[in-house]
């Protein structure tokens, strides 16, 4: 049976024809195209989840200072604030933001993370998965299933557009990570394949045009904050979709729109650290690049 797909439409068709969720279509695709046994494919994804889990929790036990210096300890501050019962966000969002920011601290200190789809956006998917797991007592196996769903969305983005900030801006990095997380969350919470991709499309609509402007050229700031924003965006999109709100624009078309917008961004706003936040006087002074002229 051919389980390969090159577009979201083809993916939905496979799901409908075989009465399978996105996660299972993606799993079978990996098995068939990679000529790899199911157990081996599952083992690799379980290992990815193990690394995600560790990177999302390690900085909460011992805050980590980044190599560049701009970030370190933010995740622990969020957790402490939450424990004081003074947070204004609900449990899922508070936890998701905390874990997402924690992963960026590990990445910025040269620790082990899973690029999902990139290092600079690596906190969004694990942040979402771990928050849902804790709040809804979800098993590791179901999380692994959801990660195959996220992988399907990431694969489509890499095949038909880009996940590189240098090509498409932050909308292509945190934006796609957020789309992956939203789709996975919808399946995890009982949504159907159409709802999953509706959520992914909503995410990209909400983040369309977001630039990539790392201060000092480091994948630290504003990247960490944007991972928190990305997982919040994913939760919003997932909730809208699960409530039955349909997305007007299909994921394939939204992906095309994101790619087109990204290619029109000037070079200064595509990971060169020459524009946006990176070009502000405060940012230049903070990274030692301010000449005073």
Language-model regions, residue ranges each:
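Functionally critical mobile loop/hinge segments
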Residues: 187-293
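Acidic-glycine-rich active-site phosphate/pyrophosphate-binding loop
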Residues: 90-107, 141-161, 206-214, 273
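Conserved phosphate/anionic-ligand binding catalytic regions in large, soluble enzymes, centered on
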Residues: 110-128, 172-177
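Alpha-helical support elements that line or immediately flank enzyme active sites
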Residues: 126-137, 182-190
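Glycine- and small hydrophobic-enriched segments that form the cores of compact globular domains
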Residues: 88, 115-122, 134, 138, ...
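Active-site-adjacent structural elements in folded domains
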Residues: 110-113, 163-169, 221
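Generic N-terminal targeting/processing segments that precede catalytic cores or assembly contacts
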Residues: 1-111, 134-135, 244, 251-293
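Glycine- and acidic-residue-rich phosphate-binding/metal-coordinating active-site segment common to enzymes
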Residues: 147, 153-166, 170-180, 191
């Amino acid at each position: 049976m051919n389980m390969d797909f090159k577009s979201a439409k083809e993916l939905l068709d496979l799901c409908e024809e075989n009465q399978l969720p996105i996660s299972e279509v993606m799993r079978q695709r990996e098995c068939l195209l990679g000529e790899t046994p199911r157990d081996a494919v599952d083992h690799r994804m379980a290992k990815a989840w193990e690394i995600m889990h560790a990177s999302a929790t390690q900085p909460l036990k011992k805050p980590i200072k980044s190599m560049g210096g701009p970030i370190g300890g933010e995740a622990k501050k969020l957790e402490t604030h939450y424990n004081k019962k003074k947070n204004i966000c609900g449990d899922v969002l508070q936890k998701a933001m905390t874990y997402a920011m924690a992963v960026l601290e590990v990445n910025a200190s040269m620790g082990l993370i899973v690029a999902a789809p990139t290092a600079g956006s690596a906190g969004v998917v694990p942040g979402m998965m771990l928050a849902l797991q804790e709040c809804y007592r979800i098993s590791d196996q179901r999380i692994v299933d959801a990660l195959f769903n996220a992988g399907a969305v990431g694969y489509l983005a890499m095949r038909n557009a880009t996940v590189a900030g240098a090509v498409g801006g932050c909308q292509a990095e945190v934006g796609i990570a957020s789309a992956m997380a939203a789709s996975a969350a919808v399946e995890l919470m009982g949504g159907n394949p159409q709802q999953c991709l509706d959520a992914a499309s909503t995410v990209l609509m909400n983040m369309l045009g977001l630039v990539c402007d790392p201060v000092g050229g480091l994948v630290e700031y504003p990247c960490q904050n944007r991972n928190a924003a990305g997982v919040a965006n994913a939760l919003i999109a997932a909730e809208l979709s699960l409530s039955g709100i349909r997305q007007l624009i299909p994921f394939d078309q939204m992906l095309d729109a994101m790619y087109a917008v990204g290619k029109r961004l000037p070079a200064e706003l595509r990971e060169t650290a020459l524009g946006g936040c990176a070009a502000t006087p405060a940012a230049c002074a903070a990274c030692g690049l301010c000449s005073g002229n």
